[in-house]
Structure formats: C-alpha cells, structure tokens
C-alpha cells in the first residue's frame, strides 16, 4: 500500500470521529486511536497539501502542541503542573511545517465562515461582538504563528551540525512575518555552536514558549467560539465559557 492510499485510509478513520458529530472529545475511549492517526498524518508528506475538515485541523494543532483547552483539566492542580513545557513538543521539521499549514488552513476556514454567514439574523450588539472576536483572532493567529516559527528556528540552531537545507527551506516557507529577523537567524546559523546556544538561551527567556502556548490556546478557543456562535458548529465551547465565567464569579 503506497503512502497516499495509506494516508487516505487513516483520514477515513478520523472522519468517523470528527465529521459525523462536528466535534471530538479527547477524553473519550477512542482518543488513543485518534492521537495515533493524527501523529501519522503529521508525518505523511502526501497529506501536506490535502484539505481536511476544520475539526481535524484543530484537533491536530491541539495534539501537536499539547494544548489543554478544557478548564476542568486545570482544576485542583498546582500552578507548576499547568505550565506548558516546550519539551513536550516534538520540534521536528516536517511535523511543525505540517502544523503551520494546518494552522493556516484553520485561519482561512475561519475567515471564510465569518464572511459567509447570514448577517440579517444578528442584532447590532452581536455584530459588534463578532467584529471584536474577529479582530482578536487575527492578532492571536499572527502572534501564535510567529512564535511557532521562532521556536522551530531555535531548535534548528541548537543542533550540531545544523540541517542547513531544511533550515533555509523552513525560513523561506514560514518566515515572511519578519524578514529581517529571519535573515539574522540565517546569518547566525553559520556561527559556531557556542554562539548559537547563547543566542537561543537569551531569546528563549525573552520569548518563552509559555507565552506562545497561551496565545495559541486562546486563538483556538476564539476560533471555536466564533464558529459555534456564528456558523452553527458544535465544539462544546459554550459550556467552556460558562465554566470559565462561573469560576471567575
């Protein structure tokens, strides 16, 4: 069985979990099967440019970056146990490139859904909330994408020897958010490992992964809420909002 056929078979398996119900609960018994499928598709080159349903793209991002979006998972836990750890993420070139592509697909689908809904049924207040949510999602998406790119670049710079071919390709594909910064990283890659490690250590302190993890989590939550409120998706997001509100009160 060639890779494309195998990938399609895995995709069909995932469809039974996501498509039929418009959402997926990662606490369910089948979560290990879903995780295995997502992991396989993350490495499948034949799937890199395949359009997947937004539910599956979101699930892949949550899995790939170890996001915990359920507030109940944070209850009764010491703060040290809720801090995101970059070491729990597999900073592998093909996987992160695929994740960035999935993240881009989510944003495109989100924007399409927001444009296509029927505006006539909404009050002025709801339309104002829609615009506010949309602006927030755009900012969060831009920041999250830039953070993932930086941390993947950090991983490349920590390696000895550096994989210059994939490093250059990664910067060309995903570094357009800040060309000057990417050019500086490219120059740094030609220095010895000691200088690279000093640079990475300093910048990891300035831009910790916990910051970008928080931004990415908020972006996914914001996207789910928009799709649920304005486009009739069902991510159980309203239940999460209720839980957060009750905790604050």
Curated annotation (Swiss-Prot):
Keywords noted in UniProt: Chromosome, Cytoplasm, DNA-binding, Nucleus, Telomere
GO CC annotation terms, alphabetical: chromosome, telomeric repeat region; cytosol; nucleus; shelterin complex
GO molecular function terms listed in the Swiss-Prot or TrEMBL record: DNA binding
Top-level division of the source organism's lineage: Eukaryota
Example GO biological process: telomere maintenance
Transmembrane regions listed in the UniProt entry: none
DNA-binding among keywords: yes
Signal peptide interval: none
Subcellular localization(s) per the UniProt record: Cytoplasm; Nucleus; Chromosome, Telomere
Assembly notes: Interacts with pot1, rap1 and tpz1.
Its biological purpose: Telomeric DNA-binding protein that negatively regulates telomerase and telomere length.
Name by which UniProt lists this protein: Protection of telomeres protein poz1
Organism this protein belongs to: Schizosaccharomyces pombe (strain 972 / ATCC 24843) (Fission yeast)
Gene (name only): poz1
